[in-house]
Design a protein with these regions (language model features):
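Binuclear metal-dependent phosphoesterase catalytic core
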Residues: 1, 6, 22, 105, ...
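N-terminal active-site segment of His-dependent metallophosphoesterases
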Residues: 1-65
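Active-site-proximal beta-strand elements of phosphoester/diester hydrolases
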Residues: 16-26, 109-119, 149-153, 201-207, ...
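Active-site glycine-centered loops adjacent to acidic/histidine catalytic or metal-binding residues
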Residues: 24, 52-53, 82-83, 153, ...
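Metal-dependent catalytic neighborhoods of phosphoester/phosphodiester hydrolases
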Residues: 32-37, 52-71, 86-99, 160-165, ...
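His/acidic metal-ligating clusters that form di-metal
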Residues: 40-47, 122-199, 224
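Aromatic-lined substrate-binding rim segments of carbohydrate-active enzymes
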Residues: 61-78, 138-144
Length: 230
């Protein structure tokens, strides 16, 4: 989680935060390298968020190769757990290389909640999504945080999610300070949905094969969203 420290230090008291989202880079190593090159050409980027599925089969070699490619980024990056990342011993490897599957950090005045939503891979035997983690985040908001962005691999109502508690999940997300929007991957598509008809948009990022990433800017005027092809 050294990258989280880098993000928090570099964005401390910044009034405008700009970040990119990539997802589902499994198998597509050349395209992932091209994504890194495209992102490195920007001079307006604070960090990169990878919403999971770095591996296809949960193999250590896959994670290491993805880590090595992503380490070529000029800016810090963080990675979420995808459903494919859970296969075989993938969860253990993910934790060793990238850290815990539920985590949060602050960039400027924005709290980023990064959540494991791959309930199917855990046979519904674990707290996925971890509502207690979300509640604790809501109860202990760091000083200076004014708004929130939530990231996950699988979006609500996908086959991966525990959809019995979808409304409950959204309720606690909305308890966070001024929830702006959510980002996710998994479906290998670009889409924008308002799953709960509550004004909160969910932005889906496509896979590396489709050679695009999402770019967000957050400031006092709200936020902007862009799909960038490379």
């Amino acid at each position: 989680r050294r990258n989280i420290e880098r993000i928090e230090t570099a964005t401390y008291r910044k009034e405008e935060i700009r970040f990119a989202v990539i997802s589902d880079t499994q198998r597509w190593y050349d395209e992932t390298e091209d994504a890194v090159e495209a992102l490195n050409r920007r001079d307006d980027l604070d960090f990169v968020l990878h919403t999971g599925d770095m591996s296809d089969f949960g193999l250590k070699l896959e994670f290491e190769k993805q880590r090595d490619i992503l380490s070529g980024l000029k800016v810090p990056f963080v990675c979420l757990l995808g459903n494919h990342d859970c296969l075989a011993t993938g969860l253990d490897v993910f934790r060793k290389i990238f850290g815990t599957e539920d985590f949060a950090f602050t960039a400027g005045n924005v709290r980023f909640l990064c959540l494991n939503t791959n309930a199917l891979e855990f046979d519904y035997s674990s707290a996925v999504p971890n509502i207690q983690f979300i509640r604790e985040e809501g109860d202990h908001v760091p000083e200076g945080v004014e708004k929130t962005v939530v990231a996950m691999h699988a979006g609500p109502f996908s086959e991966q999610c525990n959809n019995n508690i979808a409304e409950y999940f959204q309720y606690y997300l909305r308890e966070m300070p001024d929830l702006q929007f959510c980002v996710y991957g998994h479906g290998h598509n670009v889409s924008v949905d308002e799953f709960f008809d509550d004004g909160i948009k969910y932005y889906e990022c496509s896979c590396a094969k489709d050679r695009s990433y999402l770019f967000f800017t957050l400031n006092s005027n709200g936020y902007t969203y862009e799909v960038v092809n490379f």
